[in-house]
Amino acid sequence: GLVGSERCIRDRCDVGGFSSRPGAAEVTPEEEWRRVEAGVAAVRRIAPTLPVSVDTFRAEVARRVLETFGPVIVNDISAGEMDPAIVDVVAEYDVPYIAMHMRGTPATMQGMTSYRDVVEEVVSYFRLRAEQLRRCGVRRLIFDPGFGFAKTLEQNYDLLRGLHNLCSLGYPVLAGVSRKSMIYKVLDTTPDRALAGTIALGWECLRQGAAILRVHDVQEAVDTVRIFKAFRP
């Protein structure tokens, strides 16, 4: 789920049909669409008014979702780099677009972690990418720094410490740290036992200015946001 921190607590459901984990099996566009269609349809049956984001980098899948279900948030792990045509689809339908920072592809990204300064390079990337996307007609931008995508453990924490620099660009920032390896490797545990670390890093993301948290444990995240809002009204 996606839990927002701006003004009020807003829940969204993120639906994807393509795993971005390193080593995950390749999925054809048709199979991805089949999975996404089933997922979005299920959400719409259960909660017709709940905002939905669709996790895809493929223009074809994004277009079919928008044609079938109407407006959704498009959540693209490649910020339009893997399938540039997705940018035109987003602009045509004028829907919110989550652009994530990643080098390479999910299959190659872990070998592309050489940065002079990870914070500076991610911020510079989004500063330039924002101009490019806006020129293409994308108006409703959300940035995701891509924790765990083409970053080492140390770089993830460097990026978290400097997250306020990305937030200062003036666009909403989505932070996805839930159950990530940057938590469970430090704690020497497993993803399903990383809730306490997830809450701790989620709080820090909020403190740095993140507008949205991408989470697995929705109620715990909502509680974290509510306490944060009480602490910093």
Outline where the language-model segments fall.
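N-terminal glycine-rich anion-binding loops that anchor highly charged ligand groups
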Residues: R10-G17
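Generic detector of short, aliphatic-rich beta-strand segments that form the cores of beta-sheets
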Residues: R7-C8, V225
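Active-site-adjacent loop and "lid" segments of alpha/beta metabolic enzymes
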Residues: S20-I46, L50-S53, F57-A59, L66-F69, ...
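Single conserved hydrophobic/aromatic residue that forms the stacking wall/gate
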Residues: G1-E6
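Acidic/histidine-rich, metal-coordinating catalytic segments
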Residues: G146
